[in-house]
Amino acid sequence: IETTDGYITIVGSKNIVHKIHQMLEQTQERLYVLASGEILSEFMQDLQNLVAIGKKVVILSDDFEIPSAICHKTTTEKNQIRLITDSSYVLTGVISGNEHDTCLYSGQQNLVSVMKEALKNKIELLSK
């Protein structure tokens, strides 16, 4: 893990998976995630738990749904994940299951805002 001005580069699939689990466990209000069903299936229990305790969960995926979550069907880029928790933290990058996978994690408001806007635009397009 490498820190640069509020941005953390997370390298290796195991480290990324651990960070995602941690982010999901610490979600206070809402979660937005864009990823393939293959990636999201690894986090099924965490996602179901968030829905069960009343958190807002918005999923953009090719083939993944959870009852009571807001799900939008869309094409996804292979091995890509975009995750925003509580409008405060973002994780984006590649997770394919190997040690060379890399994700960027940040609580920097400018990156969070850019990512939120991108996901919002995608949701608006899917809703038309």
Language model segments and positions:
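PLD-like (HKD) phosphodiesterase/transphosphatidyltransferase domain
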Residues: I1-N49
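C-terminal regulatory/effector modules of DNA-binding transcriptional regulators
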Residues: S36-K128
